[in-house]
Amino acid sequence: MANHASADKRNRQRITRTARNRAIKSELRTTVKKARTALKGVPQESAAPVTAAVSALDRAASKGTIPAKRASRVKSRLALALHKASVAAKTAAS
Protein backbone atom coordinates (compact mmCIF):
# COMPACT_ATOMS: atom_id res chain seq x y z
CA MET A 1 0.00 0.00 0.00
CA ALA A 2 1.24 3.46 -0.85
CA ASN A 3 2.45 5.69 1.96
CA HIS A 4 1.75 8.93 0.10
CA ALA A 5 -1.20 10.20 -1.88
CA SER A 6 1.04 10.92 -4.86
CA ALA A 7 2.30 7.32 -4.86
CA ASP A 8 -1.28 6.08 -4.74
CA LYS A 9 -2.17 8.29 -7.70
CA ARG A 10 0.86 7.06 -9.66
CA ASN A 11 -0.28 3.50 -9.02
CA ARG A 12 -3.79 4.27 -10.30
CA GLN A 13 -2.30 5.90 -13.41
CA ARG A 14 -0.02 2.90 -13.98
CA ILE A 15 -2.95 0.50 -13.86
CA THR A 16 -4.96 2.62 -16.30
CA ARG A 17 -2.08 3.05 -18.74
CA THR A 18 -1.12 -0.62 -18.57
CA ALA A 19 -4.67 -1.67 -19.41
CA ARG A 20 -4.87 0.82 -22.28
CA ASN A 21 -1.49 -0.17 -23.70
CA ARG A 22 -2.30 -3.87 -23.40
CA ALA A 23 -5.53 -3.39 -25.38
CA ILE A 24 -3.79 -1.32 -28.05
CA LYS A 25 -0.96 -3.85 -28.41
CA SER A 26 -3.39 -6.75 -28.61
CA GLU A 27 -5.40 -5.04 -31.35
CA LEU A 28 -2.16 -4.15 -33.12
CA ARG A 29 -0.90 -7.73 -33.09
CA THR A 30 -4.23 -8.96 -34.45
CA THR A 31 -4.23 -6.37 -37.24
CA VAL A 32 -0.65 -7.16 -38.28
CA LYS A 33 -1.39 -10.89 -38.18
CA LYS A 34 -4.42 -10.36 -40.45
CA ALA A 35 -2.25 -8.39 -42.87
CA ARG A 36 0.41 -11.13 -42.95
CA THR A 37 -2.26 -13.78 -43.50
CA ALA A 38 -3.79 -11.72 -46.31
CA LEU A 39 -0.38 -11.43 -47.98
CA LYS A 40 -0.26 -15.22 -48.26
CA GLY A 41 -3.55 -15.16 -50.16
CA VAL A 42 -4.66 -13.09 -53.15
CA PRO A 43 -2.34 -10.06 -53.57
CA GLN A 44 -5.12 -7.79 -54.88
CA GLU A 45 -7.13 -8.31 -51.69
CA SER A 46 -4.18 -7.87 -49.33
CA ALA A 47 -3.70 -4.12 -49.81
CA ALA A 48 -6.57 -3.15 -47.49
CA PRO A 49 -5.40 -5.21 -44.48
CA VAL A 50 -1.85 -3.92 -44.95
CA THR A 51 -3.14 -0.34 -45.03
CA ALA A 52 -5.13 -0.98 -41.85
CA ALA A 53 -2.05 -2.44 -40.16
CA VAL A 54 0.09 0.55 -41.16
CA SER A 55 -2.53 2.91 -39.77
CA ALA A 56 -2.71 0.98 -36.49
CA LEU A 57 1.08 0.95 -36.22
CA ASP A 58 1.21 4.72 -36.76
CA ARG A 59 -1.46 5.28 -34.10
CA ALA A 60 0.33 3.09 -31.56
CA ALA A 61 3.69 4.76 -32.25
CA SER A 62 2.26 8.27 -32.01
CA LYS A 63 0.76 7.47 -28.60
CA GLY A 64 4.02 5.98 -27.38
CA THR A 65 2.60 2.49 -26.93
CA ILE A 66 5.32 1.02 -29.14
CA PRO A 67 8.62 2.58 -30.19
CA ALA A 68 8.53 4.53 -33.45
CA LYS A 69 11.41 2.52 -34.90
CA ARG A 70 9.58 -0.75 -34.28
CA ALA A 71 6.51 0.60 -36.06
CA SER A 72 8.69 1.73 -38.95
CA ARG A 73 10.39 -1.66 -39.16
CA VAL A 74 7.12 -3.60 -39.22
CA LYS A 75 5.60 -1.21 -41.77
CA SER A 76 8.66 -1.59 -43.98
CA ARG A 77 8.47 -5.38 -43.84
CA LEU A 78 4.76 -5.37 -44.63
CA ALA A 79 5.30 -3.03 -47.59
CA LEU A 80 8.12 -5.20 -48.90
CA ALA A 81 5.99 -8.34 -48.59
CA LEU A 82 3.10 -6.60 -50.37
CA HIS A 83 5.42 -5.51 -53.17
CA LYS A 84 6.84 -9.02 -53.56
CA ALA A 85 3.36 -10.53 -53.62
CA SER A 86 2.15 -8.08 -56.26
CA VAL A 87 5.23 -8.66 -58.43
CA ALA A 88 4.80 -12.42 -58.13
CA ALA A 89 1.14 -12.10 -59.11
CA LYS A 90 2.01 -9.97 -62.15
CA THR A 91 4.67 -12.41 -63.35
CA ALA A 92 2.30 -15.35 -62.82
CA ALA A 93 -0.41 -13.57 -64.82
CA SER A 94 1.95 -12.84 -67.71
UniProtKB/Swiss-Prot annotation:
Residues 11-20 have a biased composition (Basic residues). Keywords: Ribonucleoprotein, Ribosomal protein, RNA-binding, rRNA-binding. The keyword Protease does not apply. Residues 1-10 have a biased composition (Basic and acidic residues). Residues 1-20 are annotated as: Disordered. Belongs to the bacterial ribosomal protein bS20 family. Binds directly to 16S ribosomal RNA. This is Small ribosomal subunit protein bS20. The lineage of its organism: Bacteria, Pseudomonadati, Myxococcota, Polyangia, Polyangiales.
